[in-house]
Curated annotation (Swiss-Prot):
The entry's keywords: Disulfide bond, Knottin, Neurotoxin, Secreted, Signal, Toxin
Subcellular location: Secreted
Natural source organism: Conus tessulatus (Tessellate cone)
Domain characteristics, as noted in the entry: The presence of a 'disulfide through disulfide knot' structurally defines this protein as a knottin. The cysteine framework is VI/VII (C-C-CC-C-C).
GO cellular component, one term: extracellular region
UniProt name for this protein: Conotoxin TsMEKL-011
Bridged cysteine pairs (disulfide): 49-63, 56-67, 62-71
Tissue: Expressed by the venom duct.
UniProt family annotation: Belongs to the conotoxin O2 superfamily.
Origin: domain of life: Eukaryota
Annotated signal sequence range: 1-19
Gene Ontology MF annotations: ion channel inhibitor activity; toxin activity
Length: 75
């Protein structure tokens, strides 16, 4: 009887694993590989930096951190 219980538990784990794989796995956090640093969005919301396409004189002024007389989104 104990062997049957263990067998049923193993079968349940295998079936749930298979269902998880078929659905595409667990929901994963999407990573934005193009972002230079993450605090940029927070700085922009708080008004601590200039958003992209805004005028600038140094990279520290821009939320994206890239200044060429205006804030650029990418380097």
């Amino acid at each position: 009887m104990e062997k049957l219980t263990i067998l049923l538990l193993v079968a349940a784990v295998l079936m749930s694993t298979q269902a998880l794989i078929q659905r595409g796995g667990a929901k994963r956090r999407k990573v934005n590989f193009f972002s230079i640093r993450e605090p940029g969005a927070e700085d922009w919301r708080e008004g601590n930096c200039t958003p992209w396409l805004g005028g600038c004189t140094s990279p520290e002024e821009c939320c994206p951190g890239n200044c060429e007389t205006y804030c650029r989104a990418w380097r």
